[in-house]
Each structure stands twice: as structure tokens, then as C-alpha cells.
């Protein structure tokens, strides 16, 4: 009992410390944590460098992973490199990866794609708050076609996914429809909770204009070996990112001659 209380207190303190990164101080951080415990959907507005952004209690794990632990920091040079890189953020959640990329390169042209209607509302709010005209967002589910599909929403907002038993309907968008008219795509980030097989394997040739792809695989939810096989035919250079907190594989794929 005592050990459990100590563990919970330590976790609360650790979370309060990193939450101060986005809020005015410890009092604001504690207030945010207590309100989120009562209602995980309650909205808080904080700051990430020059950007105001909003988040919920159910988004804490995403905040920690993307902005505190800087999981995508290995992409810094790729985002900095082109003067105005074209980036597709597929499975954008509330837009944290996009915010990170805009901090690295304020003139990046980003399209964020998010399936969950509730999460999309926060994403849309963050796009507006950023005041970046090069950042746009659409409420669609990355899929093998553009049909309407069912979507399951669960307590941890990072784990929403396509599911035949899901209670939410959302229109799909295929890889071809998403990339059509974009020209060269400097970077595509994909984190879509198991839909990566349907999204990428339906028409791999459409990946031709994508210079770099970073993708999280979900072995329990799709045939990730099939995804790997498809990617190896398109991207000669593939590295699995090591040292992650998550056990899910994160692959960084590049075309021949494309710098890291």
C-alpha cells in the first residue's frame, strides 16, 4: 500500500516537472494535472516555444513522447534542410509533431491528417493558434480507399484506430488521394495504429514522390512484415530507430541519395 502511494506520488511529481515546460509554473502544472484527473477531456492551453497550443489530459502521453522526450529529434536536419519542406503528418493526433517541425523550420508546408473527430477539433484549434498559413489539417482516416469507415476511440487518445466495431464513422483517404498534386514530399510521418498496412500496401507506387518516410509499426494490429517488404522495394535505405520507450518499431526510410 505504502509502496503504491510512493510510486503514484513520484509519477505525479515527475509529470508535474515536465508539464512545467508548457505552463507558467508548478502551480499551473498541478492545477492542470488535478483537473485532468477529474476530467481527462478538459482542455488546457500552454506554450511550446513560440506557439500557443491546446491539449487534454488524455493527450499527456503524446506530449511526453513528442515534445518532452523529442522522439523525432533524429529528423531535425531533414526538416531544417529544404528552405520550405513539404511534410505530410498522417495520424497527426493534436498536431504535436507538426508543432515540433514548425519550431525547427517555421516555413515548413504541413498537411496534418487525423481521423478522430474529437481529436481533430483540438488539432484544428492548434492550427489556428499557430497562425501559420502553411499548416493545414483534414479530418480523414488514412486507409486503402476513400470509403467511409468505422473508427474506435479509446481513453488514451494516441490509441484510437480503425475498427469494424468502432462507434464513430469517418471518411477514409487513400495514399493516392492524399499525395496527389503535392509534387515532391520531403517527409511523410505515419502513425495510424495498425492501418499502415491498408494505407501503404494498397498502391506502393504512389510513394514515388516521398523522399523520406518515418513510420511506427503496430505488430499486434496488422501484418507489419508485409509493410516492411513493401517499404524495402521503394526505399533503399531503412533504419530502425533504437532507444525508444515504446516497444513498437519506428522505421526511418529514405530514397537513394537523400540526406538523413
What are these language model-derived features?
Residues 1-260:
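Phosphate/nucleotide-binding beta-alpha loop and adjacent structural elements of enzyme active sites
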Amino acid at each position: 500500500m505504502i509502496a503504491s502511494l510512493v510510486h503514484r506520488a513520484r509519477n505525479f511529481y515527475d509529470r508535474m516537472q515536465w508539464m512545467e515546460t508548457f505552463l507558467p509554473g508548478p502551480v499551473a502544472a498541478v492545477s492542470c494535472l488535478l483537473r485532468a484527473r477529474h476530467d481527462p477531456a478538459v482542455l488546457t492551453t500552454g506554450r511550446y516555444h513560440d506557439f500557443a497550443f491546446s491539449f487534454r489530459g488524455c493527450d499527456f502521453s503524446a506530449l511526453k513522447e513528442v515534445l518532452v522526450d523529442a522522439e523525432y529529434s533524429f529528423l531535425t536536419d531533414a526538416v531544417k534542410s529544404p528552405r520550405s519542406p513539404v511534410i505530410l503528418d498522417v495520424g497527426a493526433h493534436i498536431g504535436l509533431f507538426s508543432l515540433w517541425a514548425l519550431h525547427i523550420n517555421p516555413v515548413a508546408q504541413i498537411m496534418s491528417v487525423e481521423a478522430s473527430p474529437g481529436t481533430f477539433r483540438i488539432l484544428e484549434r492548434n492550427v489556428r493558434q499557430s497562425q501559420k498559413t502553411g499548416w493545414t489539417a483534414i479530418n480523414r482516416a488514412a486507409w486503402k480507399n476513400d470509403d467511409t469507415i468505422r473508427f474506435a476511440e479509446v481513453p488514451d487518445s494516441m490509441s484510437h484506430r480503425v475498427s469494424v466495431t468502432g462507434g464513430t464513422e469517418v471518411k477514409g483517404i487513400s495514399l493516392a488521394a492524399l499525395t496527389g498534386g503535392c509534387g515532391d514530399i520531403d517527409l511523410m510521418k505515419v502513425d495510424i495504429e495498425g492501418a499502415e498496412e491498408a494505407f501503404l500496401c494498397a498502391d506502393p507506387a504512389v510513394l514515388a514522390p516521398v523522399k523520406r518516410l518515418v513510420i511506427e509499426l503496430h505488430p499486434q494490429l496488422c501484418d507489419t512484415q508485409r509493410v516492411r517488404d513493401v517499404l524495402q522495394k521503394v526505399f533503399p535505405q531503412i533504419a530502425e530507430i533504437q532507444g525508444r520507450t515504446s516497444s513498437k518499431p519506428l522505421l526511418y526510410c529514405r530514397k537513394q541519395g537523400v540526406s538523413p
